[in-house]
């Protein structure tokens, strides 16, 4: 008698839940495993929601092996192909625990290869046409999952096209917010993210290979993209920030500032320590901002989330800020959060160019930083007004949120990349009015 999927999963090595890209030697998964739910894709392929002995839950693309067992599907095995084929059929899933939502354009394609990058999720390119992204670790029952499914669906329904065209979503029907198991979007061959294309553009500007107008055009295009994204996301609704919301922002920002002051070493730390009381005073301005509109936002918005291919721009990764708890990633936020994320990253592109380019003239780069941020904001405001959505954006949040973003850059440097400390140090040096530096 052939063992069923549940029996095969229970007998498998607990490392079954880990993708090959994850450092298996450093991640101990306790067994035995238990199969909570299974979507059978046919021909020995399935998607399982698997629970380890510590109650952690995992999305596992499964394939039966030649020895009568089961293993995690690898790129080339065909499980991602079978998921895309299921989307193309647009049929209901045989198990009510799963929701398979197909958008326009899903079609059966063949051929798989993995994307070799360090990421939380596992991605497979199918037929050089689509990218299947498997969510690896799932939230505990009752906890909110990734907001990506709802945000991608809202953008697709709202006619937002500045993202890789969504083919479909696989979710687990659980509670008020479905849990995302896999997303399928169009593959953009040759696409570069902003830490490549934007740095290259500004470097070419500094070398005289681009005019200032040419180098500023992407910033304006990103401003338009961001406004269209926010207008589409806001169609899901908006809520006013309460006094408690605003107070919580201030508490979190002051805690981060205190941590940065205590942990940033050297001359950069001394400068931050001197600036900290003035930055905290700016944070106090938040107290007057109860009532500002909150909407679904991207949540981790910077140039690295913007792909450029064939002169077009596409925003990716709607999972929210990975360092935040799931409930905060899913919560509505001010539109200014995304605006600040992008304007700060435009600034940081310029800092990187000056730091990494020998003999570069910093003057045109610094001029580009200021002009690019203005171009972005002007296009953003103009597009919101054209969409009758200018009430989404409260520009009183720009300064406190921007200071908070640079403080988080200090913390990122301390925790992960020590040399990065030059970026927020230079940014705040230019950002802070002279009166705040005294």
UniProtKB/Swiss-Prot annotation:
<feature type="binding site">
    <location>
        <position position="319"/>
    </location>
    <ligand>
        <name>Mg(2+) 2</name>
    </ligand>
</feature>
<feature type="binding site">
    <location>
        <position position="409"/>
    </location>
    <ligand>
        <name>D-glucosamine</name>
    </ligand>
</feature>
<protein>
    <recommendedName>
        <fullName>Glucosamine kinase</fullName>
        <ecNumber>2.7.1.8</ecNumber>
    </recommendedName>
</protein>
<feature type="binding site">
    <location>
        <position position="317"/>
    </location>
    <ligand>
        <name>Mg(2+) 2</name>
    </ligand>
</feature>
<dbReference type="InterPro" id="IPR011009">
    <property type="entry name" value="Kinase-like_dom_sf"/>
</dbReference>
<keyword id="KW-0067">ATP-binding</keyword>
<feature type="binding site">
    <location>
        <position position="193"/>
    </location>
    <ligand>
        <name>ATP</name>
    </ligand>
</feature>
<keyword id="KW-0479">Metal-binding</keyword>
<feature type="binding site">
    <location>
        <begin position="186"/>
        <end position="188"/>
    </location>
    <ligand>
        <name>ATP</name>
    </ligand>
</feature>
<keyword id="KW-0460">Magnesium</keyword>
<keyword id="KW-0808">Transferase</keyword>
<dbReference type="GO" id="GO:0000287">
    <property type="term" value="F:magnesium ion binding"/>
</dbReference>
<keyword id="KW-0547">Nucleotide-binding</keyword>
<feature type="short sequence motif" description="Substrate specificity determinant motif">
    <location>
        <begin position="405"/>
        <end position="420"/>
    </location>
</feature>
<keyword id="KW-0119">Carbohydrate metabolism</keyword>
<dbReference type="GO" id="GO:0047931">
    <property type="term" value="F:glucosamine kinase activity"/>
</dbReference>
<comment type="similarity">
    <text>Belongs to the actinobacterial glucosamine kinase family.</text>
</comment>
<dbReference type="GO" id="GO:0005524">
    <property type="term" value="F:ATP binding"/>
</dbReference>
<dbReference type="InterPro" id="IPR043674">
    <property type="entry name" value="GlcN_kinase"/>
</dbReference>
<feature type="binding site">
    <location>
        <position position="305"/>
    </location>
    <ligand>
        <name>Mg(2+) 1</name>
    </ligand>
</feature>
<dbReference type="GO" id="GO:0005975">
    <property type="term" value="P:carbohydrate metabolic process"/>
</dbReference>
<comment type="function">
    <text>Catalyzes the ATP-dependent phosphorylation of D-glucosamine (GlcN) to D-glucosamine 6-phosphate. May be involved in the phosphorylation of acquired extracellular GlcN derived from the hydrolysis of chitosan, i.e., in the incorporation of exogenous GlcN into the bacterial GlcNAc metabolism. To a lesser extent, is also active on glucose, but is unable to phosphorylate maltose, 18 other sugars and several aminoglycoside antibiotics.</text>
</comment>
<feature type="binding site">
    <location>
        <position position="317"/>
    </location>
    <ligand>
        <name>Mg(2+) 1</name>
    </ligand>
</feature>
<comment type="subunit">
    <text>Monomer.</text>
</comment>
<feature type="binding site">
    <location>
        <position position="133"/>
    </location>
    <ligand>
        <name>ATP</name>
    </ligand>
</feature>
<keyword id="KW-0418">Kinase</keyword>
<feature type="binding site">
    <location>
        <position position="300"/>
    </location>
    <ligand>
        <name>D-glucosamine</name>
    </ligand>
</feature>
